């Protein structure tokens, strides 16, 4: 059964079809949630919340071909809402699990990058993370965040310019 068939079944109330759709892209969903939440537990909680929301709203999906972008947008909004409720600043964490840390220098570099990113405003952080860490194109980021593509480009450009000033200022 292909993705469109699974989406049609999910719209009819088939939970297994919905779970299969999500499992087919589980790595992408997890990486996206992790980019926002910064740790495994919160990322998995966000994924669970996304599944509940998807199941409750799957019948509202007009275009079955847009399922994955629609579901990722729900995941991003779920992460943002969770962070907002906690009144936390967006914490774009690095993966702290030892299996992903090859050596001390790599860990230190990732930490430095995250430290610098946290000095940007939340919108610039989000755009830069989605573009360079999640490898998304401008159009996808625009759809995911519900902002015009030009605004995405502007946030990335201004964020990178600010990073350059921050980093340059510290090493001069």
Describe each model-derived feature in a short phrase.
Residues 41, 115-126, 134-151, 162-165:
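Helix-turn-helix DNA-binding module
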Residues 30, 40-57:
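Conserved RNAP core-binding helix
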Residues 59-62, 73-92, 158:
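Arg/Lys-rich amphipathic alpha helix in sigma70-family domain 2
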Residues 21, 25, 29, 50, ...:
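Residue-level preference for hydrophobic side chains embedded in well-ordered alpha helices
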Residues 11, 49-66, 86:
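Sigma70-family region 2
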Residues 23, 34, 131-133, 138, ...:
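Short amphipathic helical patch at the helix-1/turn junction of helix-turn-helix
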Residues 88-117:
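Internal acidic/polar
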Residues 1-27, 35, 114, 118, ...:
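N-terminal module of bacterial RNA polymerase sigma factors
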């Amino acid at each position: 059964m292909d993705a469109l068939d699974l989406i049609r079944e999910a719209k009819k109330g088939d939970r297994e079809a919905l779970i299969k759709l999500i499992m087919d892209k589980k790595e992408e969903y997890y990486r996206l949630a992790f980019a926002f939440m910064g740790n495994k537990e919160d990322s998995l909680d966000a994924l669970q919340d996304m599944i509940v929301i998807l199941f409750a709203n799957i019948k509202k999906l007009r275009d079955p071909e847009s399922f994955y972008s629609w579901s990722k947008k729900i995941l991003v909004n779920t992460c943002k809402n969770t962070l907002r409720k906690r009144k936390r600043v967006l914490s774009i964490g690095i993966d702290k699990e030892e299996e992903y840390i090859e050596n001390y220098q790599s860990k230190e570099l990732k930490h430095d990058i995250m430290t610098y990113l946290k000095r940007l405003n939340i919108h610039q952080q989000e755009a830069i993370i989605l573009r360079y860490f999640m490898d998304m194109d401008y159009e996808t980021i625009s759809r995911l965040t519900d902002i015009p593509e030009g605004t995405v480009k502007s946030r990335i450009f201004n964020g990178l310019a600010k990073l350059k000033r921050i980093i340059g200022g510290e090493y001069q």
